[in-house]
A protein has these predicted regions:
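Acidic (Asp/Glu-rich) sequence patches and key acidic residues
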Residues: 1-127
Length: 127
């Protein structure tokens, strides 16, 4: 499953996310307490068109840049439970219930790109 984030100020400015990165990113956003639980729930489904306003997007981008990226560094990843690892993603698909959480992570580079998108956007919609 994939998600397309479309800037509300320009139809040609968008950001693409797969479910593996997006689920983790939503947990990061949730930890900031910027958007409501209802909006977060809608953001977890593609094609909803839920809107993240400019101020929310900019705060998300700023907090990822200032709070999350310094903890990660270029060679680390963050999991959906917000734990951090320096192990590279080797593409293993974890099927065991106790290990499925390992399937969801976001790298420093991916979060940096998402943060940049948020900061440059006029708000965005999730499709």
């Amino acid at each position: 499953m994939s998600f397309t984030l479309m800037d509300m100020g320009s139809e040609n400015f968008e950001f693409n996310a797969n479910v593996w990165h997006w689920k983790t990113t939503l947990e990061v956003i949730k930890s900031f307490d910027i958007v409501s639980e209802g909006k977060l729930r809608q953001m977890s489904y593609n094609a909803t068109g839920v809107k993240v306003e400019k101020e929310e997007a900019h705060e998300i981008g700023t907090r990822i840049r200032d709070e999350i990226l310094p903890k990660l560094g270029p060679d680390k990843r963050i999991f959906a439970d917000l734990s951090i690892t320096d192990k590279p993603d080797d593409g293993t698909f974890y099927k065991d219930d106790d290990e499925q959480w390992k399937n969801y992570s976001a790298s420093y580079e991916w979060l940096k790109d998402f943060s940049d998108f948020c900061l440059r956007s006029k708000g965005f919609q999730v499709f």
